[in-house]
């Protein structure tokens, strides 16, 4: 039997992978250590989340802060996590404020560590489902999982007590349980989806998206558009029993809306549903920015140029539609202008609100929309039904929200990255973590007067 000697490229890829992992972990540890010393008080909305969780840790499950808009999943998780630590360390539950209770719920950093563990330990393991299903033999996938968890929109919340990390983990897990057609667990997927609703109500849209992917994966033969739609409908009917979990989620959500009188649990006056269509373009532009290493090449630019030249009338119509949306469906929420502790404040003030920049912004929206769709097509992991379902899910999730808030784009960003090609993983790792390094420095060293 001949001796097979791995090529130098394989060795370099493996070494690069583990060097990147070590660098990333060191960066995360340093960042968390700095956060624990720097943030002596709750950060922005943390004051509501930490206070509510600490109320639960006093076994008071009846009090609810009306400023909180999301369900109590984060606080239940924090309570269970704290109780587990108490059992393991035999520590007391007494404490108060950020400084009390060394290893309990009353230490803000203990609660923050939930998201750190979730993002750095649990999420990569969940992502392995997608990696194993698609890319076993691809040397280009060595950085795949670490680049997903390095996404700056998500990375920020590893060090704060917010709902975003847990919400994202559960949606990705639910999707992973049905994504690989040889190993599908729809009822378990629906159960995990139900759990995600306890962290963010809009996850009901992503549960519907996951159900559509489950059905689409049942279609084994590639067909034309009309025939695939027909097969999709037929598979939905013949697999109705496997869809029951998702259907139950939707029914329960409708009941919740009826009983609650709306989608948010509190602060209803500041969270009214409005048509904020431009929010989709904000999201697509963010995604395009964070995935620059995947598309910045001559081939992509040439493809975009040819699309414009070969479809001039179509692109003029699209441009007019985008302009109309910018002029008529852009909402400036009072929170956006009132709080200069968010990047969104500066993006709007210095870019989006400047009239002379509108033509350039329109072009950015046009290109990012083109790039999102073409990348999903090129990725080859989703049929046109899957791509259409993704676009609909993004729209239904974002358009009703009047607030420009980049963290709302985390789930669309992560799911997008699951279904596209990543040809330059090392470059992508450097790009993403350079952004993380810059934003971390600003967070820790640039004081903001509010």
Curated annotation (Swiss-Prot):
Pathway: Protein modification; protein glycosylation
GO biological processes: dolichol-linked oligosaccharide biosynthetic process; protein N-linked glycosylation
Any one GO cellular component localisation term in the record: endoplasmic reticulum
EC number: 2.4.1.256
Localization per Swiss-Prot or TrEMBL: Endoplasmic reticulum membrane
Function as written in the Swiss-Prot or TrEMBL entry: Dol-P-Glc:Glc(2)Man(9)GlcNAc(2)-PP-Dol alpha-1,2-glucosyltransferase that operates in the biosynthetic pathway of dolichol-linked oligosaccharides, the glycan precursors employed in protein asparagine (N)-glycosylation. The assembly of dolichol-linked oligosaccharides begins on the cytosolic side of the endoplasmic reticulum membrane and finishes in its lumen. The sequential addition of sugars to dolichol pyrophosphate produces dolichol-linked oligosaccharides containing fourteen sugars, including two GlcNAcs, nine mannoses and three glucoses.
Organism of provenance: Candida albicans (strain SC5314 / ATCC MYA-2876) (Yeast)
Keywords: Endoplasmic reticulum, Glycoprotein, Glycosyltransferase, Membrane, Transferase, Transmembrane, Transmembrane helix
Topology with respect to the bilayer: Multi-pass membrane protein
Protein's name according to its UniProt entry: Dol-P-Glc:Glc(2)Man(9)GlcNAc(2)-PP-Dol alpha-1,2-glucosyltransferase
Highest taxon of source: Eukaryota
Transmembrane segments: 12-32, 158-178, 190-210, 243-263, 273-293, 312-332, 357-377, 384-404, 429-449
GO MF, one annotated term: dolichyl pyrophosphate Glc2Man9GlcNAc2 alpha-1,2-glucosyltransferase activity
InterPro entries reported in the protein's UniProt record: Alg10
Family, as annotated: Belongs to the ALG10 glucosyltransferase family.
């Amino acid at each position: 039997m001949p001796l097979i000697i791995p090529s130098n490229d394989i060795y370099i890829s493996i070494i690069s992978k583990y060097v990147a992992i070590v660098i990333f972990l060191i960066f995360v540890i340093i960042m968390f250590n700095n956060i624990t010393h720097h943030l002596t008080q709750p950060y922005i909305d943390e004051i509501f989340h930490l206070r509510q969780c600490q109320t639960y840790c006093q076994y008071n499950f009846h009090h609810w802060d009306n400023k909180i808009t999301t369900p109590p999943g984060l606080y239940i998780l924090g309570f269970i996590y704290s109780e587990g630590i108490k059992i393991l360390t035999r520590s007391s539950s007494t404490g108060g404020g950020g400084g009390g209770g060394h290893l309990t719920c009353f230490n803000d950093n203990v609660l923050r560590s939930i998201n750190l563990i979730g993002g750095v330990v649990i999420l990569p393991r969940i992502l392995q489902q997608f990696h194993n299903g698609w890319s076993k033999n691809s040397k280009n996938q060595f950085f795949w999982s670490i680049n997903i968890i390095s996404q700056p929109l998500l990375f920020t919340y590893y060090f704060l007590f917010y709902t975003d990390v847990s919400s994202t983990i559960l949606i990705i897990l639910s999707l992973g349980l049905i994504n690989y057609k040889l190993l599908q667990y729809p009822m378990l997927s629906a159960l995990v989806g139900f759990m995600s609703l306890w962290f963010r109500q809009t996850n009901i849209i992503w549960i519907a998206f996951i159900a559509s992917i489950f059905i689409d994966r049942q279609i084994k033969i590639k067909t034309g558009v009309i025939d695939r739609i027909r097969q999709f409908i037929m598979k939905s009917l013949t697999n109705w029993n496997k869809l029951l979990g998702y259907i139950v989620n939707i029914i329960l959500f409708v009941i919740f809306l009826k009983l609650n009188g709306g989608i948010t649990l509190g602060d209803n006056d500041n969270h009214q549903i409005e048509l904020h269509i431009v929010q989709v373009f904000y999201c697509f532009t963010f995604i395009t920015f964070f995935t620059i290493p995947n598309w910045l090449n001559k081939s992509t630019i040439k493809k975009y140029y040819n699309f414009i030249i070969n479809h001039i009338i179509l692109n003029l119509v699209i441009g007019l539609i985008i302009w109309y949306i910018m002029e008529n469906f852009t909402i400036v929420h009072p929170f956006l202008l009132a709080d200069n502790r968010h990047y969104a404040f500066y993006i709007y003030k210095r870019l989006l609100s400047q009239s002379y920049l509108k033509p350039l912004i329109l072009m950015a929206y046009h290109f990012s929309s083109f790039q999102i769709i073409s990348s999903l097509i090129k990725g080859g992991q989703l049929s046109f039904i899957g791509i259409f379902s993704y676009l609909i899910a993004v729209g239904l999730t974002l358009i009703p929200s009047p607030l420009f808030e980049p963290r709302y784009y985390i789930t669309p960003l992560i799911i997008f990255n699951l279904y596209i090609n990543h040809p330059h993983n090392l470059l992508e790792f450097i790009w993403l973590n350079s952004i993380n390094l810059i934003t971390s420095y600003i967070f820790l060293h640039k004081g903001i007067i509010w």
